[in-house]
Amino acid sequence: MIVSEHEAMRARRQVALPQDALVDLMDRYEARLQGYLYNLLRDEDAVRDLVQEAFLRAYEQLRRGKPVNGPWLYTVGRNLAIDRLRQQKLVRTDFETVLESLAAEGGTKDFQRALQRLPSNDAELLYLFSVDRFHTAEIAEMLGIRPGTVRTRLFRARERLRRFYQAAEDEA
């Protein structure tokens, strides 16, 4: 993985001052992580709990001298959300549930409708890339796949979206 000098300096600071590093992480990622988890759970109380748990785990990692970054936090948050959904015995824990909720709320309905037509893995990749603005390497780290796989899936998902939009325009 290629690490910028800025990221390397941040990692060194994390090891030296875990409290300061945690504050830095919270400033940078707390709101974004809350939004991501809310899109998965649709439960504000659960989101607050899981964000707190994710940052607690980040602090524990920092105290052990291990670096923590945004993709790591998202991975922890996502895993906590999946665990929460399993505990609640929800039948559908995949990303399609999230997309249905988003479409029902309005906003960019065409985009959400188009995302619903994609396989849930592709829709999740597009969400992380387009909405949360993560780089392909970060998404790969979060999902445990190779960056090349992320790029390939993003390309295919964009092609499917393009075809959906073209079909919608042809019908109009």
Language-model features, listed with the residues they occupy:
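N-terminal module of bacterial RNA polymerase sigma factors
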Residues: 1-35, 39, 172
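Internal acidic/polar
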Residues: 2-8, 83, 90-115, 135
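Sigma70-family region 2
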Residues: 15, 52-69, 87-89, 164
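Conserved RNAP core-binding helix
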Residues: 26, 34, 44-61
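Hydrophobic-face residues of short alpha-helical interaction/recognition segments
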Residues: 33, 37, 73, 77-85
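DNA-recognition helix of helix-turn-helix
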Residues: 78, 82, 143-167
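A short pre-motif secondary-structure segment
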Residues: 125-126
